[in-house]
């Protein structure tokens, strides 16, 4: 394969409840790296509307925001029938429509504002890896992106939607960012150090059997496009989330994604820009996992940059054999030129897809959350920390406690307040679970 450079021109209920092929196994734990003591579970959103796919982020003023999607209300007409059952007016009907909701907490998640719907028109807001994301301007305004299916309802031919707070308690009318319709999926949005915004997504405007492309655009603080859509990479796995990090006041931009070659081998790569995201150099392999799988696993990498400039990446792979399957970690100490041999953080207990999320504390402690199967073959959420020395791992903590399945965890951290949220499913129903902890004491 490869590689060339590209150039631009609510009601919130509270319930207690790179060395190729090289691998090193992280130690089981250390007395000097203690576990995180989380508080009781809270439920975000309206449980009867099946909330799912949360995303957490702090605004500059210290408020914690959560965004998620949930079912749109549809009422059966008086005396109507569905699936052979008589429905009375006022009963909810199944609906493919989903809305994005945003809420905030000013007291570390103890209490929350009423959720606000972000999308101005009812549409099928996508979830899972493709769920809504939020970033914040220097004035604390929220900027949100999400994905909706194309005109024919095809999730693989979708559109990137954007809205921002309007300063009046609501959101601007949603607009589509991809200039070629029915071509964008899996968007992320990040505030740049200069006060603007990067939006990145996986694009299929050049259709065919080849892998997808990586596209970017820039927005200003008013939501106005500063650039057209532009391609910065190719060969992407079409259904895995992206990651982004900045350095040098935004002059250096790092992006991570999962690549796929002609033999359907799927490895993760780092892309680096030294001109503020205008152009990106050739991809660097993070690890040669050699995972060959015919379809996209819907499980992308996470990236973080510490105070020393080191890049930390986590990901999931099934590898070349079942014995290699699990969540992995690696670090680059030379600005992304190379990566250390991968560390196995948690071995896969069954041939299932796992999901991960990473963030760094002010003291360069790494917090890593992921999903894996327990002894009953139920998906559960786990957490582990890596101290700033890069050697001291905590033990693996089981964070969720559900009779169903828990997955797709996300993290947020401000000073010593760590927060985690995930989607819990039981049959056809889902809900969003939230927990908090004080760390670093």
Predicted segment positions?
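Bacterial N-terminal signal peptides that target proteins for export
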Residues: 1-10
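C-terminal motif of bacterial Sec signal peptides marking the signal peptidase cleavage site
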Residues: 17-19
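Extracellular, repeat-based ectodomains that mediate carbohydrate processing or recognition
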Residues: 23-441
């Amino acid at each position: 394969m490869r590689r060339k450079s590209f150039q631009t021109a609510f009601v919130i209920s509270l319930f207690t409840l790179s060395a190729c092929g090289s691998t090193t196994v992280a130690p089981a734990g250390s007395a000097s790296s203690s576990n995180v003591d989380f508080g009781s579970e809270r439920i975000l959103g309206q449980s009867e509307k099946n909330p799912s796919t949360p995303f957490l982020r702090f605004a500059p003023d210290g408020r914690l925001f959560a965004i998620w999607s949930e079912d749109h209300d549809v009422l059966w007409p008086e005396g109507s029938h569905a699936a052979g059952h008589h429905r009375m007016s006022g009963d909810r009907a199944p609906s493919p429509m989903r809305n994005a909701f945003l809420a905030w907490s000013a007291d570390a998640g103890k209490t929350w504002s009423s959720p606000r719907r972000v999308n101005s028109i009812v549409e099928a807001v996508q979830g899972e890896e493709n769920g809504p994301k939020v970033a914040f301007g220097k004035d604390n305004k929220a900027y949100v992106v999400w994905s909706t299916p194309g005109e024919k309802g095809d999730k693989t031919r979708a559109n990137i939607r954007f809205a921002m707070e309007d300063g009046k308690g609501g959101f601007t009318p949603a607009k589509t960012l991809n200039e070629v319709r029915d071509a964008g999926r899996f968007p992320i949005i990040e505030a740049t150090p200069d006060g603007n915004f990067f939006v990145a997504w996986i694009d299929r405007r050049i259709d065919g059997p080849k892998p997808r492309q990586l596209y970017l655009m820039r927005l200003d603080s008013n939501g106005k496009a500063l650039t057209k859509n532009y391609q910065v990479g190719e060969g992407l796995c079409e259904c895995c989330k992206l990651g982004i990090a900045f350095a040098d006041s935004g002059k250096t931009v790092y992006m991570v994604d999962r690549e796929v070659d002609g033999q359907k081998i799927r490895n993760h790569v780092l892309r680096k820009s030294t001109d503020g995201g205008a152009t990106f150099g050739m991809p660097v392999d993070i690890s040669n996992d050699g995972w060959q799988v015919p379809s996209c696993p819907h499980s992308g990498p996470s990236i973080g940059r510490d105070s020393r400039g080191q890049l930390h990446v986590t990901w999931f792979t099934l590898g070349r054999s079942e014995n290699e399957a699990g969540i992995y970690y690696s670090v680059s100490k030379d600005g992304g030129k190379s990566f250390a041999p991968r560390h196995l953080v948690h071995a896969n207990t069954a041939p299932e897809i796992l999901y991960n999320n990473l963030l760094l504390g002010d003291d360069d402690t790494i917090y890593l959350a992921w999903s894996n199967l327990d002894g009953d073959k139920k998906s559960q959420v786990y957490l582990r920390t890596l101290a700033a020395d890069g050697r001291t791992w905590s033990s693996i903590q089981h964070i969720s406690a559900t009779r169903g399945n828990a997955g797709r965890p996300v993290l947020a951290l401000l000073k010593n307040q760590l927060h985690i949220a995930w989607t819990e499913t039981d049959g056809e129903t889902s809900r969003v679970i939230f927990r908090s902890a004080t760390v670093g004491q």
